[in-house]
Amino acid sequence: MSMLKDPSSKYRAFPVINLPDRTWPSKTIDAAPIWCSSDLRDGNQSLIEPMDAVKKLRFWKTLVQVGVKEIEASFPAASQTDFDFVRTLIEDGHIPDDTTIQVLTQGREDLIERTFESLRGAKKAIVHLYNATSPSFRRIVFNQDKDGIKAIAVNAAKLFVKYAAMQPDTEWTFEYSPETFSATELEFAKEVCDAVIEVWNPTPEHKIILNLPATVECATPNVYADQIEWFHRNINRRDSVIISLHTHNDRGTGVAATELGLMAGADRVEGCLFGNGERTGNVDLVTVALNMYTQGINPDLDFSDIDGVRKVVEECNQIQVHPRHPYVGDLVHTAFSGSHQDAIRKGFAQQKPDTLWEVPYLPIDPADIGRSYEAVIRVNSQSGKGGIAYLLEQEYGISLPRRMQIEFSQVVQRETDRLGLEMTAQQIHALLHSEYLQANTPYALVSHRLQEENGNSAVEVEVASKGQGETNLHWRGKGNGALEALVAGLPIPVEIMDYNEHAIGAGTNAKAAAYIELRVNGERAVHGVGIDENITTASFKALFSALNRSLSQPEAKAA
């Protein structure tokens, strides 16, 4: 079987929402929502190998540390394991005073009774009721009409009131989800939710949560936003209701649907760290939160050690985070492209402390989430001079002049093409050494002596000539400065086109780096590098580096 030529014979387009006066497109997100993690329930039930109690507790502690204040811990009536985990959290004091445990149940009385029993002794708790309301579930799964579906919700809501009254020492919050909300007729979703509201009788001081799931994402995010805004406008007793979002990622737009849903009037977001969950996953709380952060909004969640959080999630879920996952993937702060690297390097050079972040290609400062800058620029065959220069400067304090960056990038390009792999900063530094600092054929500087005479410099250098049977030569010259004197003493006509120097390090361990662009015998200019504790020695080494590289080129040998 293959894809249909006419998919409309099998699939229907999702109907649009009639909301011509929608206001959400002109709204912005200006504050963090209430966050609820469903990692331990919705996320856990989707794992090939669900977490054991040890992993669950480790995950719980991570969520608390990050700052999630509402955590859906389990479906306690589903198994003894889930029930026992809730008891462990309560009895062993793992629930901070500012954090609320949440549990899920269906509408049967035995399940509800067991759920409330699991929460005995909790200071406060959210009990979450759900039943599916969409036409396909009514017809295919439950064989119920609308009245039957509404009766399930209403009867269960009454049981919530009954069993909560038996444990008056707990501060209860009730939550209801018309599961498959996004595929349910809006009028009917409102009808069911209004009926639940009447049973629970919330007030502005003691609100209930109405959670509106895109259980299966079935339309573009703007449609979900229209549904949320319509519900926000029309639900009864809106001032006593917290509207919660629970999106999935079947169409790849769970984050967008959540953000538009918040613009449409929602107050709360349920999801999982890094988007774990059934099928393609729940909305990724980390991405939504850090999207807010990069817009200047405090998300009230702390991902200062995002790699530490990732480690816990990967080990507990036994699922690796994708290297391109927003904010946390191994490659999301990494540039291989030459033009990208050049822009990033220039951005870092101009970025001042305590100013607005404006480094190109990096929407967030990696340091804010505990990342170093080491992996920002990596070099492969697509890389250019900017990335190579950045790595040498950041890792080794070597600041190549601009024209030398171009020349050395060609050397690196040849090496990456040969290897077929990316090069590390260490490999690039080694290549710089072999290409420039070890360029000692045919002339290797052995020693030099410098004297100042009447404002002029006199230089004598001893050179090992490897092209003439390893004999040592002595060249002498005078000039206005050491380099000019050395050039005057060379038996080969050379012209210094450019010279740069800088210190590497500071204090007693500092060294000098010198860079010379040299034209030999009127040929194409090449660069040389010298590094030494003495700046004069470094400049002489740089000149011999350039001289030898020029004389070693094929065109020089042919001449």
Curated annotation (Swiss-Prot):
Provide the E.C. number(s) assigned to this enzyme: 2.3.3.13
Q: Does the keyword Magnesium apply?
A: yes
Q: Which residues form the Pyruvate carboxyltransferase domain?
A: 33-307
Q: Does the keyword tRNA processing apply?
A: no
Q: Which UniProt keywords apply?
A: Amino-acid biosynthesis, Branched-chain amino acid biosynthesis, Cytoplasm, Leucine biosynthesis, Magnesium, Metal-binding, Transferase
Q: Which EC class is this protein assigned? A: transferase
Name the cofactor(s) required for activity, per the record. Answer: Mg(2+)
Query: Which residues are Mg(2+)-binding?
Result: 42, 246, 248, 282
Q: Name one GO molecular function term.
A: 2-isopropylmalate synthase activity
Q: Where is this region: Regulatory domain?
A: 439-559
Q: Which GO terms describe its biological process?
A: L-leucine biosynthetic process
PROSITE patterns xrefs: AIPM_HOMOCIT_SYNTH_1, AIPM_HOMOCIT_SYNTH_2, PYR_CT
Tell me where in or outside the cell this protein is found.
Cytoplasm
Q: Name one GO cellular component term.
A: cytoplasm
Q: Which NCBIfam families match?
A: leuA_yeast, PRK03739.1
Q: How does it assemble?
A: Homodimer.
What's its job? Catalyzes the condensation of the acetyl group of acetyl-CoA with 3-methyl-2-oxobutanoate (2-ketoisovalerate) to form 3-carboxy-3-hydroxy-4-methylpentanoate (2-isopropylmalate).
Q: What is this protein called?
A: 2-isopropylmalate synthase
The organism of origin for this protein: Pseudomonas fluorescens (strain Pf0-1)
